[in-house]
Amino acid sequence: MNVPEVNIKQLLEAGVHLGHKTLRWNPKMKKYIFGEKNSIHIIDLTQTVTFFKTALNEIHKCVSRGGKILIVSTKKQASEQVSLLAKETDQFFVNYRWLGGMLTNWNTIQNSIKRMKKLEDQLSKDDIGFTKKEILKQGKEKEKLQRSLGGIADMKKLPQLIFIIDTNIESLAVAEAKKLNIPIVAILDTNSDPTDIHFPIPGNDDARRSINLYCDLLKNTIINASKFIEIKPIDDSKEKSKNKKLNAETVVKKTEEKSI
């Protein structure tokens, strides 16, 4: 499987090893912590390398099978990068606000997406037959929907995998994915809870340099995996049956010719 290299040097340079202050830690992250320095927990990067490779392999496997990934982070430091990553790799994203039921109440969310697209279509026309006040009101509604749903506007069904940066902020996303048994890959800082995360990646979830590195690794993995999307094998049982029938007909025909 072809995934990008992950090594301790690049993680160090991006500040991935820097956790939160020791007072803010989650004891469940203890096994991922190397030690502390100046009252800040230091993440064990040897484990980060191992877990990151495992996660990237899972992402590669998902995409190469034609699966789609939902990339989630509504925090300021990651918002722009998450949007860019998803657009460059043809995946989906949520980077403004996670709406309750975004996964577990998918039918209702789809109706909201339809409403958003209808407003986009209406407001793109020169003469839409509404007053200025109505146009202004609809414009605000459209913008509100676009902020929350623009990244999943073309998502026809639930994603096969979710990638999250900061599970504390995105606790609703974690809970909904867990309920629906959707695998979660997540960056876990020293104040995170790894309990419901299938593929944890211990690392700094606040520094822009760290977030940029995560997104770059994810981007390269997805782009590479897209080249190997599995084509559904042709069911040759019908073809074999057809050939058998043709062979049988040929034999009968030859027999009839001999008897004439």
Language-model segment annotations:
Residues N2-P233:
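Ribosome large-subunit tunnel/peptidyl-transferase-proximal elements
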Residues M1-K9, I223-I260:
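Intrinsically disordered, compositionally biased charged tails
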